[in-house]
């Protein structure tokens, strides 16, 4: 089950979920109890498949208190995954490290110039947070999304990013090409 949060620190040129950036839109607001009641309809499936909830966005690591409260409701049997840019303060990652089971990290590109041109921000926080997760033994719980973004990076750039990430200890990648307008 995917839960999308509103708000993101990045302004990617081809945002895959631009409604998460809109100040108004068609959003259903849930508190933790309401969300739990809604998604627990799938609990038998979660337990049989080792599944759970993926928090995406926007940026889920800007919603730490909500995720912490949700974990208390669902217990340790459900897997909690965050689909994140990791472009948040380190403290946000530290606060949830014992709560989050898996990470899907949209790295964009390891080259800071490419990353900044595409997102409007530098990738220093991303790399710091990624190193922290690896140091804490989470490398096997991380899938890195390494997109080819037309007009921003090349196949060579993606290859180089993957090589650098492998050197850091990452083994799981989701390589794909953005469909651009």
Task: Cite the ranges covered by each PLM segment.
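Conserved AdoMet/S-adenosylmethionine-binding subsite of the radical SAM
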Residues: 40-179
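Flexible, glycine- and charge-enriched loops at secondary-structure boundaries
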Residues: 25-32, 119-123
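Canonical Radical SAM [4Fe-4S] cluster-binding loop centered on the CxxxCxxC motif
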Residues: 1-30
């Amino acid at each position: 089950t995917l839960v999308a949060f509103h708000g993101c620190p990045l302004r990617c040129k081809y945002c895959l979920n631009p409604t998460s950036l809109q100040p108004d839109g068609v959003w259903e607001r849930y508190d933790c109890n309401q969300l739990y009641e809604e998604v627990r309809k799938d609990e038998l499936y979660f337990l049989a498949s080792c599944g759970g909830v993926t928090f995406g966005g926007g940026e889920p690591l800007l919603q730490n208190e909500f995720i912490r409260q949700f974990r208390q409701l669902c217990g340790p049997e459900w897997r909690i995954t965050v689909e994140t840019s990791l472009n948040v303060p380190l403290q946000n990652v530290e606060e949830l490290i014992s709560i989050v089971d898996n990470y899907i990290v949209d790295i964009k590109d390891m080259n800071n110039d490419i990353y900044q041109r595409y997102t409007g921000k530098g990738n220093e926080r991303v790399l710091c947070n990624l190193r922290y997760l690896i140091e804490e033994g989470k490398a096997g719980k991380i899938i890195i999304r390494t997109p080819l973004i037309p007009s921003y990076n090349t196949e060579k750039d993606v290859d180089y990013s993957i090589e650098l990430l492998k050197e850091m200890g990452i083994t799981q990648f989701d390589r794909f090409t953005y469909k651009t307008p």
